[in-house]
């Protein structure tokens, strides 16, 4: 999978929802997996982690006024010092249902990011209007929630259902646009480390706002005079360390060489500061590049699957790995199963990045000898052998049972279709019972020769190689087959093809002890 090394993209697949009002903090804190309030509510032992951070909680209560637009709380469950920072930059989170299943992932912005207005000899009506807007938006808790556009209506409906008597306003913001910039270079990684150390290490709200204003004024990333007006939200994407930067604006950014047609448009040259452009290339790229890059790094989003096909648990979506979970916030919808699972340490499945390849006899032989030599596998685009990609629930993954093993014994592949005698403590029965076919997981989504698959962790530990199965009713091989599934597909030439899968453990995953 190829994509540009750097680029800026308008995330057209994302929609924004504004949640503001006196009760907005408490309202969202009861829904999100991340923490927004300085206080905790410990009703049962398993509602928060067993660590004692009472001193930190007491300090937060002294500095955070929940009736104000203080910003957001940032914490990392893998931080041994349990630091909690206050910032105007955004954070990653999820909303669960009452059974602890994922409703949607989201990115939450404090709105507005800053109150800085660039100094100008000629103050325009637009500048004056923006100044009044900032004053109004800072008067009470105010947030922007970014969700996948395919789920925005259901999320708004759910928010309004939970609202009850809370004093909050829930508004779709179709006038605002989400943007994403990335640069896969060591220099940019170092730049983001310095950026966060310089502007996003505050522990009190006043200092957080001052740092955000200084971030804009000093042109750390963006041009303050040409782009500050209309700059709404900002955050470093730390789902993967220093993965990119996200920001929200009311302006449409256009490519180089194009003319801005109105005051609501700005060219990419006028977005980033001169200092930033001297260090890093800036160019517009399609959103497909952002998605391809995310897939190749194994970063799953709930928008990758249809809402009616998903009943995922947060740990299956690697929520604990992508900085989207607080262990000390107390009660929220779906928290009991989540925290109990974390405390028990029993997580059976996770979503892995996978690569598809042609499962030929030669590939099987190479996999068998993997310890001696790295297999050279021929990649395959899943959509080339499945003209219309079926729903994820139809594409299951099973272990390569003949690897390692006797490759010449092809009959061994049919063991799951054989019958066995049923046993009873009361009588002997000759009634045949079909042996249940083992499944290690399923393909959640695919793009070219890459995909994201939900797999049993223990199976991946044994071997990262699997084969793709599809129910015979959806397979083009035969609709009258007695088997429950088929591992054969057909390419454009009508030839039968078997598809293999190699699961990859991302380098950015924490090392499990």
Curated annotation (Swiss-Prot):
Name its GO BP terms in alphabetical order. iron-sulfur cluster assembly
Per the database entry, which stretches of residues form a coiled coil?
none
GO cellular component annotations, sorted alphabetically? Answer: mitochondrial matrix
Q: Mitochondrion: present as a keyword of the record?
A: yes
**Source taxon at top rank:** Eukaryota
State where the protein is found: Mitochondrion matrix
Once renumbered to this chain, the transit peptide range reads 1-44
**Biased composition annotated in UniProt, kind: Low complexity:** 391-400, 472-488
Keywords assigned: Mitochondrion, Transit peptide
Transit peptide among keywords: yes
Q: Where is this region: Disordered?
A: 391-445, 465-494
| GO molecular-function terms, A-Z | transferase activity
Which segments show compositional bias classed as Polar residues? 409-428
Family named by the database record: Belongs to the GcvT family. CAF17/IBA57 subfamily.
Please give the name of this protein: Iron-sulfur cluster assembly factor IBA57 homolog, mitochondrial
From which source organism is this entry? Lodderomyces elongisporus (strain ATCC 11503 / CBS 2605 / JCM 1781 / NBRC 1676 / NRRL YB-4239) (Yeast)
What gene is behind this protein?
Answer: CAF17
């Amino acid at each position: 999978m190829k994509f540009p090394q750097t680029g800026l993209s308008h995330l057209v697949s994302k929609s924004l929802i504004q949640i503001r009002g006196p009760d907005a903090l408490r309202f969202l804190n009861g829904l999100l997996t991340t923490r927004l309030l300085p206080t905790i509510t410990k009703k049962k032992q398993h509602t928060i982690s067993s660590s004692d951070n009472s001193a930190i909680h007491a300090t937060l209560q002294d500095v955070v006024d929940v009736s104000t637009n203080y910003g957001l709380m940032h914490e990392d469950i893998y931080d041994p010092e349990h630091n909690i920072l206050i910032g105007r930059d955004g954070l990653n989170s999820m909303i669960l249902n009452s059974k602890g299943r994922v409703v949607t992932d989201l990115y939450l912005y404090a709105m507005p990011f800053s109150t800085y207005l660039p100094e100008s000899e000629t103050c325009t009506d637009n500048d004056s209007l923006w100044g009044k807007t900032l004053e109004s938006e800072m008067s009470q808790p105010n947030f922007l929630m970014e969700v996948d556009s395919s789920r925005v209506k259901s999320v708004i409906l759910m928010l309004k259902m939970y609202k009850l008597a809370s004093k909050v306003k829930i508004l779709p913001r179709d006038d605002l646009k989400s943007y994403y910039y990335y640069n896969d270079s060591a220099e940019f990684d170092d730049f983001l480390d310095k950026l966060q150390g310089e502007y996003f290490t505050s522990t009190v709200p006043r200092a957080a706002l001052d740092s955000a204003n200084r971030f804009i004024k000093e042109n750390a990333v963006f041009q303050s005079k040409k782009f500050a007006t209309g700059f709404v939200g900002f955050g470093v994407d730390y789902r993967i360390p220093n993965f990119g930067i996200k920001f929200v604006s009311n302006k449409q950014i256009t490519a180089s060489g194009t003319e801005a047609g109105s005051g609501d448009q700005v060219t990419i040259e006028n977005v980033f500061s001169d200092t930033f452009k001297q260090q890093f290339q800036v160019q517009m790229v399609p959103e497909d590049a952002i998605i391809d890059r995310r897939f190749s790094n194994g970063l799953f989003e709930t928008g990758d699957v249809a809402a009616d096909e998903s009943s995922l648990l947060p740990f299956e979506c690697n929520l604990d790995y992508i900085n989207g979970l607080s262990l000390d916030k107390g009660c929220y919808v779906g928290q009991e199963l989540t925290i109990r699972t974390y405390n028990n340490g029993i997580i059976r499945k996770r979503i892995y990045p996978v690569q598809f390849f042609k499962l030929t006899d030669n590939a099987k032989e190479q996999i068998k000898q993997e310890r001696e030599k790295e297999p050279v596998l021929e990649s395959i685009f899943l959509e080339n052998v499945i003209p219309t990609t079926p729903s994820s629930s139809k594409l299951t993954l099973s272990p390569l049972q003949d690897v390692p093993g006797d490759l010449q014994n092809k009959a061994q592949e049919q063991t799951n279709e054989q019958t066995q005698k049923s046993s009873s403590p009361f009588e002997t029965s000759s009634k045949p019972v079909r042996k249940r076919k083992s499944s290690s997981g399923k393909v959640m989504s695919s793009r070219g020769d890459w995909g994201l698959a939900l797999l049993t962790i223990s199976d991946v530990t044994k071997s990262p190689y699997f084969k793709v199965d599809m129910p015979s009713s959806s397979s083009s091989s035969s609709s009258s087959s007695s088997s429950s599934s088929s591992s054969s597909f057909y390419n454009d030439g009508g030839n039968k093809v078997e598809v293999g899968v190699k699961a990859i453990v991302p380098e950015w995953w924490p090392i499990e002890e």
